[in-house]
Amino acid sequence: MRSNILDYLNSQTFTNFSTSSELPWDASGVPLYLKNMKKMYVDRPQTVQEPLIDTLDDNGIVNETISVTVYVSADAKTLPTDYETMLSTVKAARLQDLTTGWRQRATSVATSFEGDILVTEFTFNFTKLI
């Protein structure tokens, strides 16, 4: 799923933002997106399986959710002119053909501040029955 989102982001044209294929942290755990503002980083997918219907023969129905997080930062005092466009474009990644076959595709966006840096975090949740 990470590669699907990376492919989508790489296919988009942004004026002030770019995409990195690196993971969001360096070897010591320092967030790269704080060092390299206006560069999007896609984290590894996280998978959760929740049983919906358990059966005695272990052939139940399970809800599998894969979550992928994208991080990007910018100077909070002077946001790039295409910041809002970037938000809309990244959120639309869940709707692309790259993510077909999923029963539910959701995106949440959260922002936080690290000093004068605005950190935007997109969390994509893709859910299917298995």
Where on the chain are the PLM-derived regions?
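Well-ordered, non-transmembrane segments within structured domains
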Residues: T69, A74, T78, M86, ...
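Compositionally biased, intrinsically disordered low-complexity segments enriched
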Residues: V48-P51, I66, A106, T123
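Small/polar-rich, solvent-exposed N-terminal microdomains that initiate assembly or binding
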Residues: M1-L56, T78-S88, E114
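Oligomerization/assembly interface segments of phage tail-like spikes and tubes
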Residues: D58-A76, I117-K128
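Acidic-leaning, charged glycine-interspersed low-complexity segments
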Residues: N16, K38, R44, T85-I130
